[in-house]
């Protein structure tokens, strides 16, 4: 059920992106070479049937690949054929540097008159007659608007709880490393998701971003001594 919802919203985002790029001309080292979910075992390959049914239900294009098919779309995997048995490729997926994209998008929005007030601390949300009347900030006082959107991730529950809104949101910590491409022929071309270790490897121009792990550790931003061991293992295992 939740996966179906995620597929629908990701498809909507994917379909809106080309128009936004065409209109703004934003550069974000984007690629249109899909995402390859890599299976290391036959059990994982067979178990992907449920995912395939959801993708088909919501018209999300995909193809099921054997080992040779995976190597055809990601040639560097030819160096480690024993590490995987096949994959599920989401052919319409795009990749790119999300930070580069959002910074450029904010600049475009500012050119159109959008005001960004960075560094503000929220003291609370003002409610009048059962409706949000403004956001109380430390430096700018009350900020008002026609519509209010709370997009604070795992911090949203703290802000909304005082006005009676409870969100089932909790922080989950992930880890990533960014590495330079030293040999194009031995590097990934798009995004590869290691199904076993839940680690994503993404090509960002002349860099590779490797991200994964889901650690329930509260709001601590501390990095343990072995925090990136898994993501480093995966990139070295698949792209030695």
Show where each model-derived region lies.
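Short beta-strand to alpha-helix junction loop
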Residues: 3-14, 37-47, 72, 88-107, ...
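Active-site substrate-recognition segment that forms the wall
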Residues: 1, 78, 122-132, 142-240
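Helical element adjacent to the flavin cofactor pocket in flavoenzyme catalytic cores
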Residues: 46-58, 78-146
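Dinucleotide-binding Rossmann-like beta1-alpha1 core, especially the glycine-rich loop
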Residues: 1-67
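Alpha-helical scaffold segments in soluble metabolic enzymes
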Residues: 16-19, 50, 104, 108-111, ...
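Conserved beta-strand segments of alpha/beta enzyme cores
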Residues: 61-63, 115, 166
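Alpha-helix N-cap/helix-start capping motif
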Residues: 42, 67-68, 99, 120, ...
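General beta-strand structural signal in soluble alpha/beta enzymes
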Residues: 63-66, 117-118, 150
């Amino acid at each position: 059920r939740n996966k179906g919802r995620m597929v629908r919203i990701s498809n909507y985002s994917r379909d809106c992106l080309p128009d936004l790029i065409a209109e703004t001309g934003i550069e974000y080292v984007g690629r249109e070479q899909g995402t390859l979910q890599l299976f290391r075992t036959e059990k994982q390959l067979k178990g992907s049937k449920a995912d395939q049914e959801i993708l088909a239900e919501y018209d999300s294009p995909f193809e099921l690949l054997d080992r040779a098919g995976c190597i055809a779309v990601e040639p560097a995997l030819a160096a480690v054929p024993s590490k995987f048995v096949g994959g599920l490729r989401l052919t319409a997926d795009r990749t790119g540097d999300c930070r580069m994209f959002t910074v450029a998008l904010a600049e475009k929005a500012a050119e159109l008159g959008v005001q960004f007030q960075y560094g503000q601390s929220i003291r609370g949300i003002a409610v009048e007659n059962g409706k949000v009347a403004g956001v109380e900030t430390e430096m700018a006082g009350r900020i008002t608007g026609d519509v209010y959107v709370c997009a604070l991730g795992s911090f949203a529950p703290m802000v909304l709880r005082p006005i009676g809104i409870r969100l089932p949101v909790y922080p989950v910590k992930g880890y990533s490393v960014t590495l330079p491409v030293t040999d194009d022929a031995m590097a990934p071309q798009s995004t590869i998701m290691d199904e076993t270790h839940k680690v994503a490897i993404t090509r960002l121009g002349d860099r590779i971003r490797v991200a994964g792990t889901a650690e329930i550790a509260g709001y601590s931003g501390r990095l343990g001594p072995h925090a990136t061991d898994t993501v480093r293992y995966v990139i070295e295992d698949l792209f030695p």
